[in-house]
Amino acid sequence: MNKLSHSVLWIVTVLVTAFNIQPKQEPIEEVIDRGLKASTEQALLMAKELETQNGRLPKTINKEGKLETSDYSWWCSGFFPGELWYLYEYNPTPEMKKYAEMYTDRVEEVKHITYSHDVGFMLYCSYGNGYRLTGKPEYKDVMLTGANSLATRYDERVGAIRSWDFNKKIWQFPVIIDNMMNLEFFSWASKASGDDRFRKMAISHADKTMLHHFRDDYSCYHVVSYDTITGMPHKKQTHQGAADESAWARGQAWALYGFTMMYRET
């Protein structure tokens, strides 16, 4: 047998051996199911941990390994109730529904918040999923009240929803890319109420953001502040990224979701 034949035989032997020792591929459905079961167990443990702490919601684990909590006013307050509703959708048990309703109730006061653009995050994740899965009319009422609260942050001269109220010496009317995530709430509110005002505000905000937040390479600024008289940008900066001209990864994700969603809705 010549050298070429030896080489070919060696390569074939290695490939056959490697193929035979590869672990059996687990069907993706089983991987997903296992992950959701683990998520359900962990979510229920968390829900029970804070069950007797009225009004409290999970926030983070600090460096000492202790659980930190928040009240309804934290911008992520609606995420845990939303998680419980998604897990209830996966496995609709009475226990999961009980906790989803309990933690959703803890963010009800968000409906009166007029100092933050995150009302969409906070209510649509929690009450939005609760309403989608149960059809409870009181959930719809909370969200429509919240939509009207959020609408107070829209300025006709700028054509967008104001994000923050701090740093007024630096920003006149700051709009952050994150705000695209709240437009889905307005889209729902228009359909649920028949009031086209919400939809028009969402479209105007998206158009304004598309026009002024993006660079030539389609990376986006974190903060664009508008002149409240002319409605035009006067500052383009970052508040959480590495630098004003950098592309903040989380902001890029907000933009991808927000504009994909607005394309779907329009």
Where are the predicted features?
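Bacterial Sec-dependent N-terminal signal peptides
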Residues: 1-27
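Glycan-recognition and catalytic cores of secretory/periplasmic carbohydrate-active enzymes
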Residues: 24-266
